[in-house]
């Protein structure tokens, strides 16, 4: 295990020496600190100098990574080996964006011809829709696309479509429906016309309860207008690996886009699940997204650990979680179009590394995945930054900021960037009580007021953050960013010895929900439940359970 290694013992000793140091002093003592603790790939700059580290920290973390076999684990992923240990499958999302022409094998078969065939199928379909060659049952072109999916079949495409708003195709609007709450579906459909709407039903197994319920409701809505099952073929396509269930639903198998069991749901936006993205921004832009991710893949695969962006990012997370005892990670993009990135990364990280059992079946004796959360700046400054600056919990922050905007309000963007850089500096530097006193005295406040306010206006600082800066948010840059986080998560899972590619924790609740759904229709649906759940079931049916 992680804590049994020699490198871990050395890291613990080092932590005891460095933890009392303040980053303000580290910067004062080292004018080259930024140059030594920053990395770049193309126009993506990763500044990790505002972390509680020195050269020895990085060396010891890389020693730990080597002792835990990280380099071998990276090679195994790219080789298509079954690194998803519980399900005995590869986790080969890197094949979906492989632009090198290099073969990638699963069980002796080069999967790239199949990957490229689906990409070609997607391109043909997107071009048909965009050109107007693909028309609805009345002969009108498609104007609205509704993606019905949940989890990885929704979060990734939804986030990417928001992020790439400046690249949206002018004739196509893309909508997303994921929640089983009928409000989301009905709110989406109320402004759409059946004759110009195309539905994408996205489910690997085509058995996801929420997705199928919404898909059936959407088909009923469509059929009330179309009055003919033969019209479904022009308005419904499936993204799935289960041909038989697609046919049973009533979708022509010719309108099915497939992907494979070595594509995990939370890594599936790079597959045919990304069809909504391709329809929304065009296939050329979708392939730029893939190319950006591939560039990060190649960097991750080949760069030495000390110069490897995902590796360093992942090791810093382990440093804080397992030595400093942090329990959460804030993601703060200073870009409104990345407002859904924290939610996307919640699934990517928490579903991947929210595990307490190693691949060997042993219980871990240390903390693993953090709670991931965040909001775009500057909104977050007016919500939770108080806790980041003066709260009692140490919470590492990732800032993301583009140098240039797609929009013409240059002054607004300058204010945005200035705030991002200021927050990063403020978290690191803090403000001593003496500095707060001096500032208030310069403002002319009386001594009694200064004495009263001084304890409240000091900031401890020494709060760590990373900053990811890029020229402008483009499809290629977005692809690099998302692949960076995917690989960072894998790095941490590999060091902890857990499986970052399964999600058994979601199963029990789904099983119980199926049973409760049946019991809600029974006379006395209380058997087999605790008193609380039984009372709540009765409450649904209007029976009195409130305390008197």
Swiss-Prot record:
Give the transmembrane ranges: none
Q: Which GO terms describe its biological process?
A: gluconeogenesis; glucose 6-phosphate metabolic process; glycolytic process
Q: Which residues are in coiled coils?
A: none
Q: Which InterPro entries match?
A: G6P_Isomerase, G6P_Isomerase_C, Phosphoglucose_isomerase_CS, SIS_dom_sf, SIS_PGI_1, SIS_PGI_2
tRNA-binding keyword on record: no
Tell me the pathway: Carbohydrate biosynthesis; gluconeogenesis; Carbohydrate degradation; glycolysis; D-glyceraldehyde 3-phosphate and glycerone phosphate from D-glucose: step 2/4
EC category: isomerase
This enzyme's EC code(s)? 5.3.1.9
Instruction: Return the Gene3D superfamilies for the record.
Output: 1.10.1390.10, Glucose-6-phosphate isomerase like protein, domain 1 (3.40.50.10490)
Q: Name one GO cellular component term.
A: cytosol
Please provide the record's keywords in A-Z order: Cytoplasm, Gluconeogenesis, Glycolysis, Isomerase
Compartmental location: Cytoplasm
Enzymatic reactions: alpha-D-glucose 6-phosphate = beta-D-fructose 6-phosphate
UniProt similarity note: Belongs to the GPI family.
**Main function:** Catalyzes the reversible isomerization of glucose-6-phosphate to fructose-6-phosphate.
Protein name per the record: Glucose-6-phosphate isomerase
Taxonomic lineage: Bacteria, Pseudomonadati, Thermodesulfobacteriota, Desulfuromonadia, Desulfuromonadales
């Amino acid at each position: 295990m992680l804590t049994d290694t020699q490198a871990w013992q050395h890291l613990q000793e080092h932590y005891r020496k460095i933890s009392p140091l303040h980053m303000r002093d580290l910067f004062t003592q080292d004018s080259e600190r930024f140059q030594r603790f920053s990395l770049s790939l193309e126009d993506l700059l990763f500044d990790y100098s505002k972390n509680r580290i020195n050269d020895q920290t990085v060396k010891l973390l890389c020693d730990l990574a080597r002792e835990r076999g990280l380099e071998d684990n990276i090679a195994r992923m790219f080789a298509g080996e079954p690194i998803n240990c519980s399900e005995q499958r590869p986790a080969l999302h890197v094949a979906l964006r492989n632009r090198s022409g290099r073969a990638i094998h699963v069980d002796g078969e080069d999967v790239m011809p199949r990957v490229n065939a689906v990409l070609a199928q997607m391109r043909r379909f997107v071009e048909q829709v965009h050109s107007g060659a693909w028309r609805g049952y009345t002969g009108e072109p498609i104007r609205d696309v509704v993606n019905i999916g949940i989890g990885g079949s929704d979060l990734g495409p939804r986030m990417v479509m928001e992020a790439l708003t400046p690249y949206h195709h002018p004739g196509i609007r893309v909508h997303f429906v994921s929640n089983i709450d009928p409000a989301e579906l009905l709110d989406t459909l109320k402004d759409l016309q059946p004759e110009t709407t195309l539905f994408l039903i996205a489910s690997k197994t085509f058995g996801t309860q929420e997705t199928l319920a919404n898909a059936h409701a959407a088909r009923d809505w469509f059929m009330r207008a179309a009055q003919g099952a033969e019209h479904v073929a022009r308005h419904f396509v499936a993204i799935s690996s289960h041909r038989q269930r697609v046919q049973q639903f009533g979708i022509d198998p010719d309108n099915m886009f497939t992907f494979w069991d070595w594509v995990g749901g939370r890594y599936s936006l790079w597959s045919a699940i990304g069809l909504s993205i391709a329809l929304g921004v065009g296939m050329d832009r979708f392939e730029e997204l893939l190319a950006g991710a591939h560039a990060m893949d190649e960097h991750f695969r080949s760069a030495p650990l000390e110069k490897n962006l995902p590796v360093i990012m992942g090791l810093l997370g382990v440093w804080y979680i397992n030595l400093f005892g942090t329990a959460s990670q804030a993601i703060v993009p200073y870009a409104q179009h990345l407002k859904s990135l924290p939610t996307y990364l919640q699934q990517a990280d928490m579903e991947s590394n929210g595990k307490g059992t190693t691949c060997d079946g042993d219980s871990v004796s240390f903390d693993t995945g953090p709670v991931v959360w965040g909001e775009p700046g500057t909104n977050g400054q007016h919500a939770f930054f108080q806790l980041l600056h003066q709260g009692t919990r140490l919470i590492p922050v990732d800032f993301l900021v583009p140098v240039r905007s797609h929009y013409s309000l240059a002054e607004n963007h300058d204010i945005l960037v200035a705030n991002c850089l200021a927050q990063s500096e403020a978290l690191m530097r803090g403000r001593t009580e003496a500095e707060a006193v001096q500032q208030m005295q310069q403002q002319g406040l009386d001594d009694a007021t200064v004495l009263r306010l001084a304890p409240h206006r000091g900031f401890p600082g020494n709060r760590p953050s990373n900053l990811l800066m890029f020229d402008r948010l483009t499809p290629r840059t977005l692809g690099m960013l998302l692949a960076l986080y995917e690989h960072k998560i894998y790095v941490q899972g590999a060091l902890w010895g857990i499986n970052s590619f399964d999600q058994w924790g979601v199963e029990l609740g789904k099983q119980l929900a199926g049973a409760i759904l049946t019991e809600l229709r029974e006379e006395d649906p209380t058997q087999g439940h605790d008193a609380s759940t039984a009372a709540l079931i009765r409450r649904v049916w209007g029976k009195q359970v409130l305390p008197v």
